[in-house]
Amino acid sequence: MNEIMLSIRDLHAQIGARKILKGINLEVRAGEVHAIMGPNGSGKSTLSSVLAGREGYEVTAGSVEYLGRNLLEMEPEDRARAGVFLAFQYPVEIPGVGNMYFLRTALNAQRKARGEEELDAVDFLGLAREKMKLV
């Protein structure tokens, strides 16, 4: 059985007095891929924002655990280091910064936060090629 990576239980959240999430439940195990789908206004962006720790969203009930840790008690920076963050669907290209360099920097920030050794460019490229075979 695969480890539970993300567990959301009876999550309620609001912005101001407007209640948006009303009892969300979701469990994601290692190796699973889930798509959050729904019409405009159904709470997809709110759920993402709550998980990432964006300001302005108030969780009024429920719990969220990520890799056994209470995600709702973590600062947004700590969530990002753990791997929970929002990224642009169409990121702005930064001249001179390639995607592989950007991804290696992001991965190494996570590895450093976990006390693991950072990957050099050669090791990262090998890892990236290995993971691309899975897609």
What residue ranges belong to the model's regions?
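ABC-family P-loop ATPase nucleotide-binding domains
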Residues: V92-V135
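ABC ATPase NBD Q-loop/coupling interface
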Residues: S63-R79
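Short coil-to-beta microelement around the adenine-binding A-loop and adjacent beta1/P-loop entry
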Residues: R18-K19, D78
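Short hydrophobic beta-strand immediately N-terminal to the Walker A/P-loop
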Residues: H34-I36, S48
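Conserved structural motif at the start of ABC-family nucleotide-binding domains
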Residues: L6-I8, L21
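The feature captures the beta-strand-to-loop junction immediately N-terminal to the Walker
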Residues: M37-S42
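Helix-to-loop junction immediately C-terminal to a conserved catalytic motif
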Residues: A52
